[in-house]
C-alpha cells in the first residue's frame, strides 16, 4: 500500500504532465479535469494540487536550477515526464518540509513508474547536485 504522500506526488506529476501537454491551462482547471477522469481522493488530491500549483508558480526558476545541475543537458532535451519529476522534487527540496533523501528516493521511484529505463539514474544524479547546491545534503 502506498503512503498518501507518495500518491500525492504521483498525482501531482500527472497534473504537471497534463498541464504541460494542454498548453499550460490554469492548474485548477487541469486538476479538476484530472479528478473527473481518475475519481476523487480528497486527501491526496488537495496535497497534489498544492504541490503542482507551487511547481507551476516557480517553474521558470526550477527549470533554470535543473538545467544548471543537468550537465550538458538543455531542458528541451529532457523528456516531459522526467522534466516534471525534476521540477516537483526540486520544489520539494526548496520547501524543506521532507528530508532530502525522502524527496530524492520518491522522485527516483516516480521515474521507475512513469519514465524510461535510464531516467531513475539521471533523476538521482541531477537531484543530488541540486540538493547539494541548496545545502540540503
Residue ranges: model-predicted function:
Residues 1-137:
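N-terminal interaction/assembly modules
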Amino acid at each position: 500500500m502506498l503512503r498518501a504522500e507518495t500518491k500525492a506526488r504521483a498525482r501531482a506529476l500527472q497534473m504537471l504532465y497534463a498541464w504541460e501537454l494542454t498548453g499550460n491551462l490554469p492548474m485548477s482547471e487541469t486538476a479538476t479535469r484530472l479528478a473527473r477522469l481518475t475519481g476523487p481522493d480528497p486527501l491526496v488530491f488537495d496535497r497534489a494540487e498544492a504541490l503542482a500549483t507551487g511547481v507551476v508558480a516557480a517553474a521558470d526558476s526550477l527549470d533554470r536550477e535543473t538545467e544548471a545541475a543537468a550537465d550538458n543537458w538543455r531542458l528541451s532535451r529532457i523528456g516531459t515526464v522526467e522534466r516534471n519529476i525534476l521540477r516537483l522534487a526540486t520544489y520539494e527540496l526548496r520547501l524543506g518540509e521532507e528530508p532530502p533523501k525522502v524527496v530524492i528516493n520518491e522522485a527516483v521511484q516516480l521515474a521507475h513508474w512513469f519514465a524510461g529505463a535510464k531516467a531513475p539514474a539521471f533523476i538521482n544524479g541531477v537531484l543530488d547536485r541540486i540538493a547539494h547546491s541548496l545545502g540540503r545534503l
